[in-house]
Amino acid sequence: MRHNCCHVSFASILKILNFLQAFIGISIIIYSIWMLDQYNHHVPVDPPPSQPPAASSPDSSYSFSNSIIEINSVSDSLKNPIDFVSGIVLGSGGGDSGFNLRSLDLPAPWFIYCFMAIGILVCIVTIIGFIAAEAINGCCLCFYSILKTLLIIIEAALVGFIVIDRHWEKDLPYDPTGELNSLRAFIEENIDICKWVGIVVVAIQLLSLLLALVLRAMVSPRQSELDDEDDFENPMSRARDNLLGPQANQTSSGSSNIDNWRSRIREKYGLINSQSHTPSA
């Protein structure tokens, strides 16, 4: 299918935006590999000192009643799934018995793995965007728009988690690599630059999504118009063939009749000449 100049222009802009996002994703992956190498070849950060065990209470019935109260509070939280999920995300479990992300058994460099997963996800979505911009296909553009929307929602959820929960670092598992604290300190020292970088990244992603939706809307009517033109041209060509078919048959039959007539005339003329030459001989 041929594409007009407008389709090619929008696709070229979408390729440029995807190239910028691919650069961001590759940078995240390279930085994650560097952090993992630093963690593997250097002494990891010591874990925080564990709290001393609480002194045993002389009254065993009091401790038993406290455990019953904790079990009841957990069961009450399970009855309300929305509150339970919000308690998991925000870490507000109601006291020490609340379930938070620190209770999860994660590998030691979990922050590095999560950071690398974000870079890989950005690169995958970017590759799909390149394919969609090159093919200018409706299905590819629709799939790319869905993935880009999900990626933006995940990023918005992470930002919302940090903004809503003022003590979000206490709700996350302990990072023995120390890279989370280093990244946070770097962002706090260069908060103005990081704000502008974040705004530019979000603007690039939103503009990519908008271009994909516009290009998807432009491709669909064009494809339907071409299908309608094909459907209109096929009956016309068939009707033209039906009209021209008898004439072609008549022409071929007429030419064959003329050839037969000429061959008969030649045979007759040849016969007459032979008869005229025999008496003279």
UniProtKB/Swiss-Prot annotation:
Keyword annotations of the record: Membrane, Phosphoprotein, Transmembrane, Transmembrane helix, Vacuole
Membrane is among the record's keywords: yes
Cytoplasmic side: 1-15, 132-143, 216-281
UniProt feature, compositional bias: Polar residues: 247-260
Keyword set includes Zinc: no
Membrane topology: Multi-pass membrane protein
Modified residues (Phosphoserine): 256
KO phenotype (gene knockout): Slightly reduced efficiency of intracellular multiplication of tobamoviruses (e.g. crucifer strain TMV-Cg), characterized by a reduced amplification of TMV-related RNAs.
Subcellular location field: Membrane; Vacuole membrane
Signal peptide: none
One cellular component term from this protein's GO annotations in UniProt: vacuolar membrane
Subunit structure: Homodimer. Constituent of tobamovirus replication complex.
Name of the molecule in the record: Tetraspanin-20
Species for this entry: Arabidopsis thaliana (Mouse-ear cress)
Lineage, uppermost ranks: Eukaryota, Viridiplantae, Streptophyta, Embryophyta, Tracheophyta
Encoding gene (name): TOM2AH1
